[in-house]
Amino acid sequence: MTRRALALLGVIALIVTAFPMLDGSSASRASGVFAGRVHETFQPSDGKIYILVLGSDERHGNAQRARSDAIHIVGINADTMRGGILNFPRDSWVDIPGYGSAKINEAMHRGGPQLLARTLENLTGIRLDYWVLTGFQGFEGLIRRIGNVPITLKRDIYDPGGSGARLEAGRRRLSSWKALAYVRTRKAFKDGDIARTSNQGRFLLQMLKLLNKQVEKDPSAVFKWIAAGREFTDLNIPADETFRLSVLATQVGAGRIGNVTVPVSIGSVGASSVVFISPRATALYSRFRKNASLR
């Protein structure tokens, strides 16, 4: 297997074990985690790999036809081992192929992850390789397996009527339910979902730091991540390959991955509150498309 292919699967393994998101989805397994190809064949361009990472708002029913509350493109350049997380607020007003203009989270409801992928490909000009869809049912189990997640909060986060978050500012180690509350919180922030989507990207980076730290201290810790990933996901990767990929994932330093939310302005369409993506995003897409990195 080529280094580039290994890098792709390593990143997928990392995301699936390290970034459960938001409101839940039903599945045959506890997690409600699904993954698939955007196109029939995987054809990375010059070592650049792009994965669409989604969180569903569905607690019961078909998670793949629910509205997406978390929308991120993760890019990795397998040659430079740099990357980026490009975040899209769920209320972004975009053109959905075959349906006209609507909030971006409507795309998955209309046509599943594939339609949302097409929507983002048209918007950004980036050819996506894989999609990963997560729910929250396996989230707490994953955190319990791999350990509390260290993070520094610049302010108190209090959201009793929404996510249930009651988090004090400062250096914290988030337990499973506190971590879930953190990535779900929007009502506690003035800019709502814009802050939430940025925090989701930040949480992924904190998970990567935790993985790096644990494996640096004890290389056998990678088995704990593998076990958690295999228990809580529907990604079919053989155990021996999962091991190789997880080891590779530890080589991607969080400091080499940028976390950027597309620039937007708040507005309305009819009675609906939406956000409009700024024309300034065009340069951001071009940079990400060229380098698969936001660092």
Where are the regions that the model predicts?
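Non-catalytic, solvent-exposed segments at the cell envelope interface
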Residues: 1-295
